[in-house]
Amino acid sequence: MTPTYAPSLLDKLLGDADEAQRGVLARYSIERIKASVARDIEHLLNTHASFTPEELAAYPHAARSLATLGLVDISSLSMASDRDRKTISDSIRHALMRQDARLREVEVAVREDRSATAKLSFSIRAKLMLHPHTEPVAFDAVLHPGSQRYEVGAA
């Protein structure tokens, strides 16, 4: 029998109305869980933090609040600079480690993109914590510099 898992809180809140009306307890396949995580990562990366945790260091509760949800502003960084690309990938990794408790051992790397389009691609690898198991996951993230928007999908 293929294992199934309980959906995340967000999936429960946004869940299937038909299942809720029938009183069905939703169980997701690993593929559906991974798709849900990809969606959540995309939402997180497209959210801009009001403050960095460092700016709120004197206020530890605020530093762990929604005020720091998302990524810091990267609009002043150059996509052509290796140092700035590392800064962006580090920012993604820190945001995922700090703000998604389901993910452990998060690694983010810039991928070389040979296409003619102006975009920056990342590879995200982590371990997804699914009680009582862990599942290795991999996602591709693409930053479109003009809009500063990310797209995330399964690798």
Range-by-range predicted roles:
Residues 1-80, 129-155:
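Immediate N-terminus of the mature polypeptide
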Residues 68-98, 102-112:
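Acidic, low-complexity glycine/serine/threonine-rich segments
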Residues 101, 117, 132-134:
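A cross-taxa feature marking solvent-exposed loop/turn segments within ectodomains of secreted
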Residues 106, 122-124, 137-139:
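Hydrophobic residues positioned within well-ordered beta-strands of beta-sheet architectures
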Residues 111-122:
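Beta-rich nucleic-acid/ligand-interaction surfaces
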Residues 120-132:
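Charged, glycine-enriched surface loops/patches
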